[in-house]
């Protein structure tokens, strides 16, 4: 029973400290768009992994550098002959008969050797190429991190706006539902008093049912899009998160002002990656050619050896005999059956492929910037058109509503005005979304972080 209680208390303690650790994490309750971007760039899991990859590349750089620095190693060797080897020596050396052999055992049963070895690379062409390659590898890792940051930033902005746009749509749908409920109540009274037809009442109920279905769908989408935003931010999906900004505060003049005077591809991240790919292939070509160069290294070894009949190597009176050695090693490649030549030619072809790919990427990005700029300009124009159409459709619907209940227009005309308003509301939402997507897409191509 006591053991069970101890286990129970231990489990409760673990749960308590786990809950305390979770509560101690600093998660904001509400974020603006800028705060969401900042939080996401620090906590997004893809960015964290890309950052760790840069750190790995940095360590790889120092690992390569260390190859050309002094390498020191120590060793210790203990041997205990259970039976010493026997050698045969002509017996005449000891005064015996010619043609006979004497059995002799040399040395002591136990031997211990301890030493230190220093190795130093003096010249290796491939090592020098490797040093250059580590810098390129580090640059490539940094490019991947930069591309990841750009893509995550774009996704965060799009997701943040998606939540706001879904909420704006919910606002439209709720307003439409309430208006339809009010109209339906008034229409039922007219029908009961014989001033309208039953078909008009049924038509209003169908419209109301459709709007309520769309509203339920939009409310579910609000939760889903908010969870997607949390996932991008590295934020717990189970924790509440409020968005401080709204569409009014974000649809400022800056949203509709991105000017591309002369499209440049130099700062585009895909161009940077292609440039580093070319550098990498060029270094690989140099590396294959460097395999024909000689390699020169030096070493220095020093050791002490002790011999004994029994294990006395830890005693002070044990005798140790020293030895040291210095040497230089030269390796000169002579003939590889044309393998080095084939590898060099293959690497040279890869360089030409990388050059062609770089040129292709530059031209493609240049065209994409022009197309994206044109699409953004069109999206801005469509937004202002959609905004005007929404205001116009609202006025038309309100006028037709008054005329309908005054008996000046029929249910068909009123129905058309309602559908025109719903369509204008939908187009307005899509227009804002298009402006945001086109703008952030253009900024990503230009590698610009302007808001």
Task: Spell out what each predicted region is.
Residues 59, 148-265, 375, 379, ...:
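Periplasmic alpha-helical coiled-coil/stalk elements that build and connect Gram-negative outer-membrane
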Residues 25-28, 75-116, 246-254, 299-332:
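Small/polar, glycine/serine/threonine/aspartate-rich low-complexity segments that form flexible
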Residues 62, 117, 284-287, 329:
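Outer-membrane beta-barrel architecture
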Residues 48-52, 65, 122-149, 199, ...:
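Sec/SRP-type N-terminal targeting helices
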Residues 66, 213-235, 388-448:
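Short segments within alpha-helical structural elements
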Residues 24-73, 77, 83, 237, ...:
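Bacterial Sec-pathway N-terminal export signals of envelope proteins
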Residues 1-39, 88-98, 219-260, 443-451:
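Terminal intrinsically disordered/low-complexity segments used for targeting and assembly
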């Amino acid at each position: 029973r006591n053991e069970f209680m101890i286990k129970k208390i231990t489990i409760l303690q673990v749960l308590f400290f786990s809950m305390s650790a979770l509560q101690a994490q600093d998660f904001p309750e509400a974020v603006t768009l800028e705060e969401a971007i900042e939080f996401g760039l620090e906590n997004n899991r893809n960015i964290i992994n890309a950052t760790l990859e840069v750190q790995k590349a940095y360590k790889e750089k120092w690992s390569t550098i260390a190859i050309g620095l002094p390498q020191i190693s120590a060793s210790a060797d203990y041997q205990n002959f259970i039976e010493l080897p026997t050698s045969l020596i002509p017996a005449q050396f000891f005064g015996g008969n010619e043609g006979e052999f004497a059995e002799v055992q040399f040395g002591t049963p136990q031997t211990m050797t301890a030493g230190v070895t220093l190795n130093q690379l003096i010249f290796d062409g491939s090592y020098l190429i490797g040093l250059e390659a580590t810098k390129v590898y580090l640059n490539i890792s940094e490019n991947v991190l930069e591309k990841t940051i750009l893509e995550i930033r774009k996704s965060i902005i799009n997701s943040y706006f998606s939540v706001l746009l879904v909420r704006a749509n919910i606002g439209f749908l709720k307003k439409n539902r309430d208006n339809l409920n009010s109209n339906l109540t008034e229409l039922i009274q007219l029908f009961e008093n014989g001033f309208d037809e039953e078909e008009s009442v049924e038509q209003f109920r169908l419209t109301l049912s459709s709007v309520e279905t769309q509203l339920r769908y939009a409310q579910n989408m609000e939760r889903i899009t908010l969870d997607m935003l949390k996932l991008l931010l590295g934020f717990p999906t189970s924790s509440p998160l409020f968005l401080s900004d709204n569409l009014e505060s974000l649809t400022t003049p800056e949203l509709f002002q991105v000017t591309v005077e002369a499209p440049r591809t130099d700062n585009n991240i895909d161009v940077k990656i292609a440039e580093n790919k070319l550098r990498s292939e060029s270094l690989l070509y140099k590396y294959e050619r460097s395999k024909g160069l000689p390699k020169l290294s030096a070493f220095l070894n020093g050791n002490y050896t002790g011999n004994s009949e029994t294990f006395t190597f830890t005693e002070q009176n044990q005798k140790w005999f020293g030895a040291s050695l210095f040497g230089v090693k030269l390796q000169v490649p002579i003939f590889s059956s044309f393998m080095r030549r084939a590898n060099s030619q293959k690497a040279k072809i890869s360089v030409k492929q990388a050059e062609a790919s770089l040129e292709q990427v530059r031209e493609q990005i240049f065209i994409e910037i022009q197309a994206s700029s044109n699409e953004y300009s069109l999206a801005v124009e469509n937004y202002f058109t959609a905004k005007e159409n929404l205001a116009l459709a609202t006025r038309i619907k309100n006028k037709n509503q008054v005329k309908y209940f005054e008996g000046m227009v029929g249910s068909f005309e009123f129905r058309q005005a309602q559908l025109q308003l719903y369509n204008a509301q939908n187009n307005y939402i899509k227009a804002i979304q298009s402006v945001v997507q086109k703008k952030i897409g253009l900024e990503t191509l230009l590698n610009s972080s302007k808001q």
